[in-house]
Design a protein with these regions (language model features):
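An amphipathic, aromatic/His-enriched active-site/gating alpha helix that lines ligand/cofactor pockets
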Residues: 25, 29-37, 56-90
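N-terminal first-folded block
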Residues: 3-32, 37
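Alpha-helical structural elements of signaling/regulatory helical domains
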Residues: 14-15, 45, 72
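Short, well-ordered beta-strand segments in beta-rich or mixed alpha/beta enzyme
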Residues: 3-10, 40-67
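Short hydrophobic/aromatic patches at helix-to-coil boundaries
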Residues: 93-97
């Protein structure tokens, strides 16, 4: 079973470009972390200020480790949150078939 994170970020009006830049910085770094199985961001074509991040980790601890990395702390908590109107994070586990 993998641990899944589905996050939705909605940028404040006029701030979508800042969020896109943060995602472009974080994605390649995050993909290299131990325990990261998949990490991909999407943007809504109908609502370009709305972003969806789909992430898979080996387990919940790998996700906690991700949130505690220097780059996550700096770019998300130290920067991106200032430009977000909304941020939701939901977690799931895969169903092995």
């Amino acid at each position: 079973m993998a641990f899944v994170v589905a996050a939705t970020w909605k940028a404040k009006p006029g701030e979508a470009d800042r969020i896109t830049e943060v995602i472009k910085i974080l994605t390649p770094i995050s993909r290299q972390e131990p325990g990261v199985l998949f990490y991909q961001a999407q943007v809504s074509p109908e609502e370009p200020e709305t972003f969806f991040l789909y992430e898979q980790y080996t387990d919940a601890q790998a996700y906690e480790d991700h949130k505690n990395t220097e780059h996550f702390q700096r770019h998300v908590f130290g920067y991106a949150l200032d430009y977000l109107a909304e941020r939701t994070v939901k977690t799931y586990q895969t169903i092995d078939v």
